[in-house]
Amino acid sequence: GNYSIKLRKKINTDNVEEIWNGDKEKEKLGVEYFGVGDLEVSHNDKLLAYSLDTKGSEYYKIFIRDISTNKLVTKEITDTSGSITFSLDDKYIFYSKLDENHRARKIYRHKIGDHLSEDYLVFEEKSEAFTVGISLTSDEKYYLITTSDHNTSEQYYFGVDEITPKPKLIIKRQRGILYSINSWANNFYNHTNNDAEDFKIDISSSLENQSWKPFVPSKNEVLIGGCVFLKNWIIRSETSDALDKLFIRNISTNFEEELIFSDEKVYVPNISLKQKDRNTDEIYLGYSSPKTPSRVYSYNLSDKSKKLVKEQEIPSGHNSEDYIV
């Protein structure tokens, strides 16, 4: 097919369920152009929210359907950026509206099933140069609103249980300074280029009374990436000499080591969560190199075992021993 398929299966079962098939959806609509912006499943696994551009305008319509019946549960939301974030109780979605200049400058909260005229304006960016987005922190305690241009960012936060969200500023914007906050295990992490050309990660126990201390200091000619959090682990990335590296930190011991995944000197690793619950030692670890097609492994951070779950098929065939890097 030409478009993505979204599958899911319950943990420890072999029953795979198809909840989205882009080719079938395009055929059903009978449109020439079919752009998918976002596909999000609700926290209770009952709803699928998706955004479509069927004109090539990059203005997306948001739809929400009941997965079990395939029926829409709310009126389509028009003129959005396409991104969708469910509230933790799955009663609402957050989305951003595009203005006439095609910029996302307003964040709204929509109660599923309600009329669109009742949508609540959570945040509005006054500068025409900045665009906004909303996300959930890794510990699912806060929503973060990020407003940014290509080299400056600013973030606001509010609690997931706030009935009437009132976003609070984290750090006032400074020209040329990028920062991105996350929270995990009662700490806040700031991935920023403030006094760190190639970024660093600072840590603070509070956003109300910020006291930022180094967590991963800046390094000369090393690009510091962000963090992925699991119950027992923090996974982060670095890039140096054009090579990507992954580092695994045990939260209880604070011991950190590089994840050496291959004896090849040149390869590109990437990780993704294996399951929604972060109380796990397992991740999906993607891997590719100039001589090896893309592979995805199930990787156990505790015992370092791995299992191949998917490999890119090369129609003409492939033998990695035929190549030298």
Which stretches of residues belong to each language-model region?
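Beta-propeller blade signature
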Residues: 7-10, 63-68, 108-114, 157-161, ...
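A flexible loop/linker signature enriched in serine peptidases of the S9 family
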Residues: 1-5, 25-33, 52-61, 76-80, ...
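Hydrophobic beta-strand positions that form the internal "hydrophobic ladder"
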Residues: 45-49, 93, 143, 188-190, ...
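Generic long, charged, amphipathic alpha-helical segments
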Residues: 210-230
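Non-catalytic accessory segments flanking enzyme active sites
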Residues: 1-40, 51, 131-183, 214, ...
